[in-house]
């Protein structure tokens, strides 16, 4: 009897330990294993508070350190922070313990596109839909300076609504890695989907390599088999290098023409993303999407726990994830309570704003942004930004002293224009408002600033032109450009 009681207590203790361990960082309940690799395992998990299903990539920190792959992990985090798009698997947050690194990501329930294609070729309309979503996502990545370099059906997932999601940015590269010749030189990718210039090992354009892979994927969707296939890998490479493929007889003429240009062996003659998106076959039924571009610096989070150590060595920073739901949509509502006080600027902030110690650097022309100093109340500045947004039919999102203006113009591969404004306290009587482009086309941003933003904010100066005591060297309102 005593032995039985001891066994029951032992089992109960193990169950309690298991339940405690299953709640990762006090937030996520770990579920079944979804997949694994050399350094990481991916689990299905559930947010204990919201009930939302997520996928958690658990990376063994010791293995990563021993293999010298810290830079690789940092780059993957940086890339996932850059590419938030409806057709890309989303990174929610990054956390760490002393032994593990956790990527909390969107859980895509439908599985790999590969499994769908393995059953046979797709109908033209279905293939077109997936291809449109793929091009939309990849072109956005290119605009953000990210090149996937390993696009294939196995890395394309389908959600419960049948929408495509690009995943696995582990082999991706960013513009910063381009050498002095303007090209990448790392040999990577999956043999059947790799571009001929990668095989040549002479340097390659990351965008053109992705376009080649997208062409192979389109062929596979329509045909049910690969355009370049041979049991002998070297023989397959020769076919790729020569561009030796034939389209099946059931391919429409428009697809034949598109594939010939996408699978052009000479990169300089290969179609670009705009070329693809301008073809009549691509444009048929293409649904332009609206999405929210987050500030790059708001995507990493390190949980605060006794068992947690900083991921500073991995992510380079720690900050809270800011989801669109945290912002208040533009419908005239305000949160309860008074207007929040802006964050104060200290001497170090001012120096970081300026190229030198001379504060006149605050007001110099130097890039895609603007700052102005104003004596107007915070509420009045925000109201003016809302008024400008109403005039041009932009959506406004607000959180404390941050305002996001989001355009709705569709059709640009760079996404809709998105602008962030943040208010800082300079003195008790003065504030600095920093305005920056978060997403969209630079020419559209410049036009918006010159025609809408600057003139209407200058009007604020005349409405609040009273001089603030002790501010003779700083006008009550001065608009200028900066980084």
Swiss-Prot record:
Keywords: ATP-binding, Kinase, Manganese, Nucleotide-binding, Phosphoprotein, Serine/threonine-protein kinase, Transferase. CDD domains: CIPK_C, STKc_SnRK3. The modification Phosphothreonine is found at residue 186. ATP binds at residues 34-42, 57. Residues 340-364 form the NAF domain. Residues 367-396 are annotated as: PPI. Residues 313-322 have a biased composition (Polar residues). One of its GO terms (biological process) is signal transduction. One of its GO terms (molecular function) is ATP binding. CIPK serine-threonine protein kinases interact with CBL proteins. Binding of a CBL protein to the regulatory NAF domain of CIPK protein lead to the activation of the kinase in a calcium-dependent manner. Belongs to the protein kinase superfamily. CAMK Ser/Thr protein kinase family. SNF1 subfamily. This is CBL-interacting serine/threonine-protein kinase 19. It comes from Arabidopsis thaliana. The lineage of its organism: Eukaryota, Viridiplantae, Streptophyta, Embryophyta, Tracheophyta. The gene is CIPK19.
């Amino acid at each position: 009897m005593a032995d039985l009681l001891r066994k029951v207590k032992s089992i109960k203790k193990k169950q309690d330990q298991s339940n405690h361990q299953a709640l990762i960082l006090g937030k996520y309940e770990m579920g079944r294993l979804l997949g694994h690799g050399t350094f990481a395992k991916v689990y299905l998990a559930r947010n204990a508070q919201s009930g939302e299903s997520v996928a958690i990539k658990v990376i063994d920190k010791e293995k990563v350190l021993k293999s010298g792959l810290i830079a690789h992990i940092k780059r993957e985090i940086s890339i996932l922070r850059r590419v938030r798009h409806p057709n890309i698997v989303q990174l929610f947050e990054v956390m760490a313990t002393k032994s593990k690194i956790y990527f909390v990501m969107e859980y895509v329930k439908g599985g790999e596109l590969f499994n769908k294609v393995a059953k046979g070729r797709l109908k033209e309309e279905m293939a077109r839909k997936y291809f449109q979503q793929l091009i939309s996502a990849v072109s956005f990545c290119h605009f953000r300076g990210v090149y996937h370099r390993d696009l294939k059906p196995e890395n394309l997932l389908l959600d419960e609504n049948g929408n495509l999601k690009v995943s696995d940015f582990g082999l991706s590269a960013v513009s910063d890695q381009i050498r002095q010749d303007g090209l990448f030189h790392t040999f990577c990718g999956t043999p059947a989907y790799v571009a001929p210039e990668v095989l040549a090992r002479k340097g390659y354009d990351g965008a053109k390599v992705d376009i080649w892979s997208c062409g192979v994927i389109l062929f596979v969707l329509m045909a049910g088999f690969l355009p370049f296939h041979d049991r002998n890998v070297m023989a397959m490479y020769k076919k790729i290098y020569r561009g030796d493929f034939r389209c099946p007889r059931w391919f429409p003429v428009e697809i034949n023409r598109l594939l010939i240009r996408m699978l052009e062996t000479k990169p300089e003659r290969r179609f670009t993303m705009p070329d693809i998106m301008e073809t009549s076959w691509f444009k048929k039924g293409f649904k332009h999407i609206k999405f929210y571009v987050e500030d790059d610096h708001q995507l990493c989070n390190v949980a605060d726990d006794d068992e947690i150590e900083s991921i500073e060595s991995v992510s380079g920073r720690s900050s809270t994830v800011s989801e669109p739901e945290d912002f208040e949509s533009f419908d005239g509502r305000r949160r309860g309570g008074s207007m929040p006080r802006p964050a104060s600027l200290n001497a170090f902030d001012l120096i970081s704003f300026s190229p030198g110690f001379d504060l006149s650097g605050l007001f110099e022309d130097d890039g895609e942004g603007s700052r102005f100093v104003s004596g107007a109340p915070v509420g009045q500045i925000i109201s003016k930004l809302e008024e400008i947004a109403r005039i041009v039919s932009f959506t406004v999102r607000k959180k404390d002293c941050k305002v996001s203006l989001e355009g709705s113009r569709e059709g640009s591969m760079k996404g809709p224009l998105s602008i962030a404004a943040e208010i800082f306290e300079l003195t008790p009587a003065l504030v600095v408002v920093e305005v920056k482009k978060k997403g969209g086309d630079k020419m559209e941003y410049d036009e918006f600033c010159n025609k809408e933003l600057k003139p209407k904010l200058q009007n604020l100066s005349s409405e609040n032109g009273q001089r603030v005591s002790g501010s003779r060297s700083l006008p009550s309102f001065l608009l200028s450009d900066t980084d």
